[in-house]
Amino acid sequence: MSDGYHLWSERYDRELKDIFDVQDEITLAVVEALKVKLMGETKSAVLRRYTDDAEVYELYLKGRYYFNKYTPEGWMKALEFFEQAIQKEPEYALAYAGKARALTSCSYHGLLSYREIVPAWKAAISRALELDQNLVEAHIAQASFYFYHEWNWEAAEREYRKAIELNPNNSDAHQLYGTFLASRNRFDQAISEVRKAFELDPLSLHARFNAGFIFWFDNRLDEATSQVQKMIELEPKSRRGAKRFAGIHGA
């Protein structure tokens, strides 16, 4: 399979007494099926549990779901769910990292002012790293803030690379690093990173969206069109996909 979607399938019939045990079992089964070799800290990062509270975990997942819609309403909704998770479990590192990243998106897209989000962002990212200095999501959140708000290219690249070093199998880190590299006119490296993101997560809408941007910016219009078409196939109602397609073709 060069660019398809069916990599692995299996049926699981389990009593959902402990969703986290089932999650670990499925994760390891996928790793084995795809012949991914997880070593030391990478394996620990993949399997680490940051909460044993299913309700808190559900709030976090809802935050991730809405964040990944990449819409103004989605980012604001994500912020609410991450905050709810923190209120229920103040030691939940992932929720702080999610909050920090959602704040960055809300500010970058004009939903909240930069001045308004900075104290909350600093508090959230500081707490996330205090709870786990090797939290991949926290380093991604830092990188995004340095990139989009501080324009501190050196710090942004350092944090993206740190996230990938901590977990080379994190699709999000690769595709976001690819976008950063494209902004610095390092297109060959950028394309390598987004291709890695596809290998890890062929269904990632955001990776396809960013790949379309990278290819378009490098004047590779056929490849840009192909990536956006794949995005639209995955999510036919995607407004972002339609807008990016129109932008590529000057509509």
Per-segment meaning from a language model:
Residues M1-A251:
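Acidic, proline/glycine-rich low-complexity intrinsically disordered segments
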